[in-house]
Every structure is written in C-alpha cells, then in structure tokens.
A protein has these predicted regions:
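Claisen-condensing/thiolase-fold acyl-transfer catalytic domains that form or cleave C-C bonds
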Residues: 1-144
Length: 144
C-alpha cells in the first residue's frame, strides 16, 4: 500500500565524522544504478545487485541481509530466484506490502530498515535495492 512518508538521511565523510565526534551507524561500501528494458523492470534489482557486488568484489553469499523494495509483492521473490538468495536473508521484517511504500522516500525507508535489521540481528553487511521506474534500479552495499 502507498503511504505518506518523510525522511532524511545524513551522509558525511569519515574525516568529517571524526571532526564532529560522530559515530556513524553504517558505512557505504559501494553503490550501483542500472537499467533493463522497461518491460523487465521487476528484475532490475538483480541486475543492479550483480553489478554492485562485482564492482566491490563481494560474493553474494557473504551478504548477511538484503532489503529489496516491493512495490509489487513478486519483486523480491523474482530477484531472490534470479540471484539464488535464501529467503531468510531478504526483507526479514516484511517489505513494502506490509510496512508501507512511502511515496518519495522508499529508498530511505529500505536503507534505514536494513541498517536496523543488521544491528538487531548482529549482522555486519547488507544490500538494499529498489526498482526506480522505467526499468531502472539502484542498489547500495553497507557495513556496520
């Protein structure tokens, strides 16, 4: 379901965090923006995740948790199948169908959810990915 939402994420360099004595809750390892043909938009996250992990030289089975946005319930299921990701690693607290799909801040919602899930489950690395219209997808790899 669509839901109202507002969010803010603060990004800063390690140097600035040290200067301000701020303890970051996560570190960005890498990111990717990719696209596929618009009729294949539901599979776009898998393309983006593959490119992201290749660039960061990370094996998919070394990622602890994934958040894959689900404007449609089948999106994470399809991408789990394409990437051979275990179900217990994806959207472990539910996805947008159960938590809401906040118009305009879905990326911030899934990234924040991923960070908290990693902390709550004593995990250290994760990937968040989202379809962003017209066949595009964005993914980010983080560590805590």
């Amino acid at each position: 379901p669509m839901s109202d939402g507002a969010s803010m994420l603060i990004l800063m360099s390690r140097k600035k965090a040290i200067e301000l004595n701020i303890n970051p809750i996560a570190k960005i390892i890498n990111y990717d923006d990719s696209s596929v043909s618009s009729e294949l938009f539901t599979s776009a996250p898998s393309t983006s995740i593959k490119k992201l992990l290749k660039r960061s030289k990370t094996k998919i089975n070394s990622i602890d948790l994934f958040e894959i946005n689900e404007a449609f319930a089948m999106v994470p299921l399809l991408n789990m199948d394409i990437l051979s990701i275990e179900r217990n690693k994806v959207n472990i607290n539910g996805g947008a169908v159960s938590l809401g799909h906040p118009l305009g801040c879905s990326g911030a919602r899934i990234l924040t959810t991923l960070i908290h899930c990693l902390h709550q489950n004593n995990k250290t690395n994760g990937v968040a990915s989202i379809c962003n219209g017209g066949g595009g997808a964005s993914s980010i790899q983080i560590a805590i």
